[in-house]
Curated annotation (Swiss-Prot):
Name under which the protein is recorded: S-adenosylmethionine synthase
NCBIfam families named among the record's database cross-references: metK
PROSITE patterns the record matches: ADOMET_SYNTHASE_1, ADOMET_SYNTHASE_2
Molecular-function GO terms, alphabetical: ATP binding; magnesium ion binding; methionine adenosyltransferase activity
List of residues binding ATP: H14, D173, G174, K175, K249, F250, D258, R264, K265, A281, K285
GO BP, one annotated term: S-adenosylmethionine biosynthetic process
GO CC terms: cytoplasm
Role noted for this protein: Catalyzes the formation of S-adenosylmethionine (AdoMet) from methionine and ATP. The overall synthetic reaction is composed of two sequential steps, AdoMet formation and the subsequent tripolyphosphate hydrolysis which occurs prior to release of AdoMet from the enzyme.
CDD domains: S-AdoMet_synt
Catalytic reaction list: L-methionine + ATP + H2O = S-adenosyl-L-methionine + phosphate + diphosphate
Pathway note: Amino-acid biosynthesis; S-adenosyl-L-methionine biosynthesis; S-adenosyl-L-methionine from L-methionine: step 1/1
Amino acid sequence: MRYLFSSESVTEGHPDKICDQIADAILDALLTQDPQSRVAAEVVVNTGLVLITGEITTKAQVNYVNLARQKIHEIGYTDANNGFAANSCAVLVALDEQSPDIARGVDTAQEAREQLSDAELDRIGAGDQGIMFGYACNETPEYMPLPISLAHRMARRLAAVRKTGQLPYLRPDGKTQVTVIYEDGKPVGIDTILISTQHTATIDDISEESAVQAKIKADLWEAVVKPVFADLTLQPDGNTRFLVNPTGKFVIGGPQGDSGLTGRKLVVDTYGGYARHGGGAFSGKDPTKVDRSAAYMARYIAKNIVAAGLADKCELQISYAIGVARPMSLFVDTFGTGKLSPEQLLELIKTHFDLRPAAIIQTLNLRHLPQERGGRFYQDVAAYGHFGRHDLDLPWEKLDKVADLQAAAAQFLSAV
């Protein structure tokens, strides 16, 4: 069967991604000073305005206004003429402490300790109810679906040629989308490449709109598309459509063009729609929030299963109840590609991975990563995807369980 599948990504200057990065910069700053911080930060941006709200309980001392301005400047919003700039936007802060009704389900006297006993791990519950998914497949070296992998590559390259000055007329806001042709479940071609990028009204001495767009399209093909596909077997061909700014113009962008909000790019953050999503956002949440930590753990498990050769693709669902440590349910699906039965895979998962929230935090070191990485960790995954990142050293991307899973699977298979 032949079909098309599309995934999109956005640049770090997209309004929603500005919010995610500010929220995670706040999280980094708080966890660096106080690894036990409870954080549920939300950010809104609009023309000339940033609102930081949510619930935070911490011993850390952080200047939230300066932190937001620094991140906005780093992203590239430095010119007030564009309707949004780091040094001129208003930054409002409206933060409360975490609700004691929520905290009581997670708090224990032992939580602040580094190594907890099995009984202590059982006493630290999930910070909320919910369902989380993790996914991996062998379509790419990073065990991600090809469409989202390509979309992220292009979004990162689009930002890079702006930041280095290679294409100085580009502005921070941008989106990419790639449509891949599949045949019998395997990617066989590139149907469409779409890039929408904010730009100046004139380029050099070119001011006529169609001429401006023609130059942008030609430049993006050479500076973005070609480098992205340079090391890949699958290439665009004469039948591939290449669309750039299909409306014909993208001068007004960023928060001046659209308001932004944390948690509105969930599919971009994960698997590009190729796998299911539980609905919970990541950015601005400390590791006690299973929306984030359990989704990372589910990816870690799925990736190790696929890398171990136990399936070509694997999706894992985990569910939790607030205040309860052990998952309510665990479901695994290999879409007919598994070397073991679902029951055997579930047994392997339960044997080799501890899915209690406090154990996940310990296994992936989620509280101390900002401190250990010089004050920034979560803000770096807040743009260009939380998974399949070769440019970052992420604990949930490690393949350190492959040998254990292979050995355990061999015992199952030898018993048949």
